[in-house]
Amino acid sequence: MDLLLVEKTLLALFAAIIASIFISKLRGKRFKLPPGPVPVPIFGNWLQVGDDLNHRNLTDLAKKFGEIFLLRMGQRNLVVVSSPNLAKEVLHTQGVEFGSRTRNVVFDIFTGKGQDMVFTVYGEHWRKMRRIMTVPFFTNKVVQQYRTGWEAEAAAVVDDVKKNPKAATEGVVIRKRLQLMMYNNMFRIMFDRRFESEDDPLFVKLKMLNGERSRLAQSFEYNYGDFIPILRPFLKGYLKLCKEVKEKRFQLFKDYFVDERKKLGSTKSMDNNQLKCAIDHILDAKDKGEINEDNVLYIVENINVAAIETTLWSIEWAIAELVNHPEIQAKLRHELVSQLGPGVQVTEPDLHKLPYLQAVIKETLRLRMAIPLLVPHMNLHDAKLGGYDIPAESKILVNAWWLANNPDQWKKPEEFRPERFLEEESKVEANGNDFRYLPFGVGRRSCPGIILALPILGITIGRLVQNFELLPPPGQDKVDTTEKGGQFSLHILKHSTIVAKPRVL
């Protein structure tokens, strides 16, 4: 950093201190703010709580300050909600007031400052994007159109694992093959395309760029520059890398997928009844002037991240828990055999006949929630919540993981026990009918991908348990389930090596 930049930073720091003190006094008179640790000028609570605002750290703060608390992170207000009643207020009762998305220096790059659907503010653009994405992605018709493809992809995973001699002895990182499956599941829907193998050069490049995008976006290491603008010059290299990754991804999306589909469409005359895949519907909306070319790419961006990775994390968590709980794995296998018959492979229409499989999925989503803090919400205007004033443009986090793991709300929540969803919690569903359990959120900004995720989880987990005895690698009693939390993600820290012994069907 040159001398001029240092001088400017120090001048900005002095000005910000004066402004912070003034605003703090003004707001102290105006607002009845939620409780929280006492902030200091400029940095707020950042020096006290640091960058790592994962679900467990926020749970510890909730135990100290209550079901709603405020963190002043530099110039940003961060309100954390940790009770079902307040979650209902944010997501349902006051869903319009808290229906926007907060800004973030990194997500601003990856979403073009909200040109996508997931991270845009609540309003006309969001309604338009949600409508355009719903028909080709998030309906029962889509499930029925693509379910046989999902079943074929799961069958291919089973075949490939059986062919790998290491799988039944020393074990394999099965996640790698499942990642290819998930890309194929979603790229069938998006582009009527699939990748033949893990070594496909285009798949390798796409996976690498998407992985780097997720790492950069979910990391806590850029928080200081996002919260405290005077420190943003220190993020220059980080943000430059984000821009480079975005440009490479979008060029790849455009050259190899969107433009290829355009060329195919130009050689055929297709009306709406002949549109084969999601991108056809989206390009049709662009041709009608409803969205622009950039919006098309941001939709592809959303699906590449939100639909693929989150479902993959949940599959990986489910496998790890079944390996570590062989009695649950055996009970699930017994249900599959007794309900479907020996050797009969589970299909999507079978899922409603398999309550224990559904309970295993629900329990995985409860204990190992892929998005434990949901996607952050924001109020565009001053609002009220829990008897407190919430200043405009506050970032609102719903700690959905704690809602589903609070011992005051659940019986022995630390245990992986699918039976709870067949016994005392039998009426609780993943669609948000109970505000203690919100793996996909609820309300206007809930995740529409639930309609795809649940059947894919059921087919994949069911087939793996039918065809293999899933075990930890030699010399280990269990696989490591240490968590890796992100800005609002939760995945397993170390991708597990799993022994998959083929079963005689």
Swiss-Prot record:
UniProt cofactor(s): heme
Binding-site positions, heme: 447
Enzyme class per UniProt: oxidoreductase
EC number: 1.14.14.91
Annotated GO CC locations: membrane
Parts of the chain that traverse the membrane: 3-23
Main subcellular localisation: membrane
Bilayer topology annotation: Single-pass membrane protein
Binding residues for (E)-cinnamate: 213-218, 306
Swiss-Prot/TrEMBL catalytic activity: (E)-cinnamate + reduced [NADPH--hemoprotein reductase] + O2 = (E)-4-coumarate + oxidized [NADPH--hemoprotein reductase] + H2O + H(+)
Gene Ontology MF, one: trans-cinnamate 4-monooxygenase activity
Metal-binding in keyword set: yes
UniProt keyword annotations, A-Z: Heme, Iron, Membrane, Metal-binding, Monooxygenase, Oxidoreductase, Transmembrane, Transmembrane helix
SUPFAM superfamilies: Cytochrome P450
Pathway(s) served: Phenylpropanoid metabolism; trans-4-coumarate biosynthesis; trans-4-coumarate from trans-cinnamate: step 1/1
Any one GO BP annotation for this protein: lignin metabolic process
Compartments, record wording: Membrane
Homology family: Belongs to the cytochrome P450 family.
Function: Catalyzes the first oxidative step of the phenylpropanoid pathway in higher plants by transforming trans-cinnamate into p-coumarate. The compounds formed by this pathway are essential components for lignification, pollination, and defense against ultraviolet light, predators and pathogens.
Protein name in the entry: Trans-cinnamate 4-monooxygenase
Annotated organism of origin: Zinnia elegans
Source taxonomy: Eukaryota, Viridiplantae, Streptophyta, Embryophyta, Tracheophyta
